[in-house]
């Protein structure tokens, strides 16, 4: 089996998403395209030869040599502070990918889809939502997005636009709810999760992405609500980044 090679990536654009997150659009000669939900590895090499690698979800999808990803800065991390604070258009990075076949959505799957994101876990789910909107398929899609507060949401404007393209969104604000919100701030309860997501009777595929504790608690909750474990796909990230 041929190893996936490292490729040089030219940073084309850098766009702030929140006070601590940015999107990067890369031009990657030799990139083969990606499926909705895949990720890549980024490698940084210091002047003394020290290397650090981290995985990041891909927000874009499909063929071509342009890749969009979003990075949320982790305090004390080796890679994310550089990508959020230092990288500029014209810089070069090393990337490897696309990676992952499990956490992907395929257009020919007729199953309803429930997307559940915590924080920057929205990135691969946005890729899936973009792909579904572009395909114009008829199966039900829903998104539940949990963030600390409205300013912490990545791609908030685009997510709202996706409502008009058949992907309704439920917002969960865990620390501070915006003025006029119908829901007080706090974590989602099992009863609320059952009410806001596609029911088990419709046998949806469920994609959950976010911090490890969020993913584990949410996966346990949807299984407790009656969803078969084999219909639940998870992707998680820890503190180092």
Name what the model sees in each region.
Residues 2-91, 147-149, 173-176:
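Ferredoxin-reductase
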């Amino acid at each position: 089996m041929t190893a996936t090679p490292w490729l040089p990536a030219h940073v084309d654009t850098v766009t702030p998403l929140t006070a601590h997150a940015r999107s990067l659009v890369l031009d990657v000669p030799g990139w083969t395209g990606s499926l909705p939900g895949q990720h890549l590895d980024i490698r940084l090499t210091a002047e003394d030869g020290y290397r650090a690698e981290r995985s990041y979800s891909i927000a874009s999808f499909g063929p071509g040599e342009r890749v969009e990803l979003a990075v949320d800065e982790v305090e004390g991390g080796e890679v994310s502070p550089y990508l959020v604070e230092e990288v500029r258009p014209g810089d070069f990075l090393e990337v490897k990918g696309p990676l992952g076949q499990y956490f992907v959505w395929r257009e020919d799957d007729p199953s309803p889809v429930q997307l559940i994101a915590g924080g920057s876990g929205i990135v691969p789910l946005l890729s899936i939502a973009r792909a579904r909107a572009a395909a114009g398929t008829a199966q039900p899609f829903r998104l539940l997005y949990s963030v600390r507060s409205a300013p912490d949401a990545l791609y908030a404007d685009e997510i709202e636009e996706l409502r008009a393209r058949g992907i309704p969104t439920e917002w969960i604000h865990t620390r501070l709810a915006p003025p006029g919100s119908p829901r007080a701030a706090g974590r989602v309860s099992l009863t609320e999760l059952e009410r806001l997501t596609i029911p088990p009777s419709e046998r949806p595929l469920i994609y959950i992405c976010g911090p490890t504790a969020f993913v584990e608690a949410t996966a346990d909750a949807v299984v407790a609500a009656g969803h078969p474990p084999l219909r639940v796909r998870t992707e998680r990230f820890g503190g180092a980044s």
